[in-house]
């Protein structure tokens, strides 16, 4: 499966810890992330991550294009809901695209864990039918 990873600055350490905890599962899949998030994940896990540009420099749009082409099977986007960012409209577009294309989306740690465990069990294998 192709898994997208995005994290606001205040959630990047949480994303790193999540990827450390689920490294065994993530290592079986292709990972895609915005630039800084991807680099930070690679540093602590040694997982290979396809890195787009940094989020504010167009990485969100690159990931969004991959969602629109049905090339992402799940997106984990750890965001800071109480501190809006100037580029949040771009992220809202990514969230909307996940809804449009039936891409499972986690925006917090609890749902991220549910999605990653579902992937490991094969619960999201139905995504293969969409390709």
Predicted features by range, described:
Residues 60-100:
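Mid-chain, well-packed structural core segment of small domains
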